[in-house]
Amino acid sequence: MATNITWHPNLTYDERKALRKQDGCTIWLTGLSASGKSTIACALEQLLLQKNLSAYRLDGDNIRFGLNKDLGFSEKDRNENIRRISEVSKLFADSCAISITSFISPYRVDRDRARELHKEAGLKFIEIFVDVPLEVAEQRDPKGLYKKAREGVIKEFTGISAPYEAPKAPELHLRTDQKTVEECATIIYEYLISEKIIRKHL
């Protein structure tokens, strides 16, 4: 980090909270490709917006078109991908928005760092394991990525030729082969209410 820079203070979290009438947090959806992360994130964002709550979705694929377009899929690049997203999602949470991230984020240490980053800032971090058996994910395979990975066309593909480290103690564990997208979004919404991050909206 450069030594000739200065942190500039701005509005306090409490001032933003009073304006938005909600707490900020990061909802971190992690799981295999085709587990349903992005689909749940979209449904949750719509549900929150229907309740007049401020939310913003950060999607793994979309981010690689811009902020992280210089990164590949090596372990080092995956680490940097998640580090950047952790910082961005923290900024959204600090603005009292509900930041919804949907990234495979295969390494436990990266997710733990993201959690610690939020903890140091006094912000809530909600890790959600979007779980599905590998064989179900392969059957879904909407982008044909598992097929390409099995054929050796895609290298270092999570779940096939690269590891996925499942969360040990996530706030929520969703089995998407057993619950619908709408049920998963509702479970997360009700969790936010139970944790007093948001108030129940009729």
Curated annotation (Swiss-Prot):
The keyword Transferase applies. ATP binds at residues 31-38. The active site is at 105 (phosphoserine intermediate). It catalyses: adenosine 5'-phosphosulfate + ATP = 3'-phosphoadenylyl sulfate + ADP + H(+). It comes from the Eukaryota. Its EC number is 2.7.1.25. It is an enzyme of class 2 (transferase). Keywords: Amino-acid biosynthesis, ATP-binding, Cysteine biosynthesis, Kinase, Methionine biosynthesis, Nucleotide-binding, Transferase. One of its GO terms (molecular function) is ATP binding. Pathway: Sulfur metabolism; hydrogen sulfide biosynthesis; sulfite from sulfate: step 2/3. InterPro entries: APS_kinase (IPR002891), P-loop_NTPase (IPR027417). GO terms for cellular component: cytoplasm. GO terms for biological process: cysteine biosynthetic process; hydrogen sulfide biosynthetic process; methionine biosynthetic process; sulfate assimilation; sulfate assimilation, phosphoadenylyl sulfate reduction by phosphoadenylyl-sulfate reductase (thioredoxin); sulfur amino acid metabolic process. Pfam families: APS_kinase (PF01583). Belongs to the APS kinase family. Catalyzes the synthesis of activated sulfate. Present with 2170 molecules/cell in log phase SD medium. This is Adenylyl-sulfate kinase.
